Amino acid sequence: MFKTIRCNQINDKLVNQRIEINAWVKKIRHHGKVTFINLRDRYDEAQVLVSDENLLKITSQIKMEYCIKVQGTLELRPLELANKEMKTGAFEILAENIDIISRCNELPFMIEDNNNANDNAKLEYRYLDLRREEQKQKIILRSKVTHIIRNYLTKKDFLELETPTFVKSTPEGARDFLVPSRIHKGHFYALPQSPQIYKQLTMVAGLDKYFQIARCYRDEDSRGDRQPEFTQLDLEMSFIKKENIFKLMENLMFTIFKNTLNIALPKKFKKMTYKHAMNTYGSDKPDTRYELLIQDMSKHFKKSSFNVFQDMLQNKGTIKALIIKNQAHNFSRSKINNLEEHAKIYKARGLYFAKIENNEFSGGIAKFLNEIKQTLIEAYSLANNDIIFFIADSWETACKAMGQVRIKIATELNLINKNIFEFLWIYDFPLFEYDEDTKSYQAAHHMFSLPKQKYIHTLESNPSKVLGEVYDLVLNGMELGSGSIRVHTRELQQRIFNIVGFKNEIAEERFGFFLKALEYGAPIHGGIAIGIDRLLMLMTHSSSIKDVILFPKNSFAASPLDKSPSRISNEQLRELNLTIENYKN
């Protein structure tokens, strides 16, 4: 009898015992009258020694990535022949039987070479890509993380509940994926962009602690690293303040990182307001792994002779500056020009600079700084070989553009420590933002967030000034999650709908079922959604979320693996009472 084991179960206790392993051929080497086979399964590797004449005939047919069954006796290898690069390198299996379970076609790329395949090939043959150790470990980590999340929240009395996948189309910003109904001709379901409304209804139902590992869908234009379907940890709690969410998520992240990467995060994360983040880092999701803080130099230029700055200040603009210490020699004119072009992408009018050389300003706008030279040197402890960059613009543009310059400089100067994880909370976000194109207000996050108490009575008079009970969790300069305390009365929810352009009749048609629920004793409640794909990407230092999704789409929301999306038959269209115009196009 042979004992069936996995590769990682090989140990001293099994020496001289007969074992069976089912696995894939990672490597095969023929050496005259012996053949060595390296097997790989999900758990580890093992080496097989084949010397039997009949078995050698079988091994002559075996190629890499064949799936085979090996039966044999486990032996210790001579000490000098032990493979120290393998956990099981001190052992080998002396083969007695070998069966080919299934053969493998010529490989589209080498499994052991991570760099020899383009992205499209890796997506088309994702099942082969996942045999690579690095890719496999990322998916295994994903499973561990979701398991930890479930255990942690269940112990905190949360209920794991499933909200509907077919829902009413209630636009939340991006386009909905629509599903035609065969039974209800001419009617459509939408796939949820998030479980937002349904988790709030769960609170109205009195189920005060909810969570879900939720699949979400957004029909967005192709850009960057977006996926049309993604996964988030969605949770909601009743009778809470934002501090309750902060504590819950800090402890959860601590548990995840400690039990997977053996990294002890701080028990409490940094916190800063949206305004402070924008002023200091030029971003509402700042990367705090490096300093490089933005300075507001407006007060120093109030009496400056530099008309560009003077005009901007008189028009209620601001002067933002970035001081790079002891690095002026690294900024050639061409590099500075590239930085200026980068700033202009983010709508800045220009990027100005001055260097400190021989205790004097030089280059750029140096001649306009003489009258405030000593003030700047003392205020910012300037020294030789420092360089200052300036942006004069509206507050929002100056902050955002300088924030992008900050990121580019930090990347080029290699200032970012990629081996640390810096979490922080951003809170007190604006509730609304004004769209210059449509001349109307939009929800900055979403329409269900509660305004801070002091703004509730003046919502309509100045929406731009209204701050909300909204918070984001940021990790290494990336928004990991977003949440808020929610509106829990119909009257206030209707007012917010009106501000963003949903008059009563439109709001009733789209959200009537939700507004009705708010009339039946809704509790104070709030929650957060954490992007699991994004979390895993950061934990594994991956360059793309595709690496941590089992079967991802490409950048065009298509699957090279199953060739979706695909056309459907005329019969299917007739059943749905649909016709397609210009099908050939």
From Swiss-Prot:
Coiled coil: none annotated. Residues 196-199 are annotated as: Aspartate. InterPro entries: Aa-tRNA-synt_II, aa-tRNA-synth_II, aa-tRNA-synth_II/BPL/LPL, Asp-tRNA-ligase_1, Asp-tRNA-ligase_1_N, Asp/Asn-tRNA-synth_IIb, AspRS_core, GAD-like_sf. It comes from the Bacteria. It is found in: Cytoplasm. Aspartyl-tRNA synthetase with relaxed tRNA specificity since it is able to aspartylate not only its cognate tRNA(Asp) but also tRNA(Asn). Reaction proceeds in two steps: L-aspartate is first activated by ATP to form Asp-AMP and then transferred to the acceptor end of tRNA(Asp/Asn). Homodimer. This is Aspartate--tRNA(Asp/Asn) ligase. It comes from Borrelia hermsii (strain HS1 / DAH).
